[in-house]
Amino acid sequence: DSQSSRGIFTIESEQELRDRFAETEAFTNSGDYVLVERYIEGTEFTVDGIVIDGTHHTLAISQKEHYAYNRNIASKLFFTNYNETFDYDLLRKTNDELISGTGIKYAITHSEYKFEDGDYYLIEMAARGGGSRIASDIVPFMSGVDNYQLLINAALGQTPSVEDLHTSDAEKMKERAAVLEFLDIESEGKKISKIEGVEQINAIPEILQLQLEFKEGDIIEKAQDDRSRVGFFIARAESKERIEEIEKEVKNTLKVSFES
């Protein structure tokens, strides 16, 4: 009942449980307890959508990657409208049926799933949009649907309809892609002496945002939870191939130097 993956750990021994228990309990907001779940192996996904008159409509899906040193913290969300490996139509159906069954009338939504042994397992869901500009900028780009405007209209008594979800550019939207990628930089106790490449990256037309949570003189460490990640960039393009090119360009352009 917290947020930002704080207090979440993958436990593989009794000693790890003892070592992590107090920290996990400290992030519980509703009492002196912790939640223990079976660990679900497999690839993780985010799913954003909107509920209109009690029926949920999935609008954007991302496949997640995680830091090698902590598999509970996402390092990248790659958005596409179809996936050659995973059945996104099944994921849409699963998500739509599940959220429609909650009885909520109007809301934007953000859910997370894992795929294991042929099934999608719900990890969490909420009646809010995905953070880091997912709901505000990535979802409309991927779907052609202004989800926030529809929600505002509903709050003002202007009932949205399913027709508002239709777009004349559906075929064009199908090939679109976007990425929210978090930086993986550690200074190993040394202060940052120089940061280069920011202006060049911001000049890339498809870059929506480059956010650095550090400056020259800082000492930065590996992320311990979602909130302690040191920065990110968001890119949107008409194809996943272009997104992959931009990812390489950003990594080759951003240079962070440290004091010797």
Kindly label every feature range from the protein language model.
Residues G7-Y120, G129:
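Internal nucleotide-binding/catalytic subdomain
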Residues F9, R38, T80, P140, ...:
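Short, well-ordered beta-strand elements within core beta-sheets of diverse protein domains
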Residues D1-S2, Y39-G42, G103-K105, E175, ...:
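A short catalytic or substrate-binding loop motif that flags glycine-/basic-rich loops and adjacent residues
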Residues L90-S111, A126-K191:
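Active-site "cap" helix and flanking loop/linker of ATP-utilizing ligase/carboxylase catalytic domains
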Residues D1-S5, G131-S132:
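A short, flexible beta-alpha/helix-coil linker loop
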Residues A68-N72, S132-S136, K174, A203, ...:
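A short, polar/proline- and glycine-enriched secondary-structure boundary/capping micro-motif
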Residues I152-S260:
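Peripheral (often C-terminal) accessory segments that flank ATP-dependent C-N-forming ligase machineries
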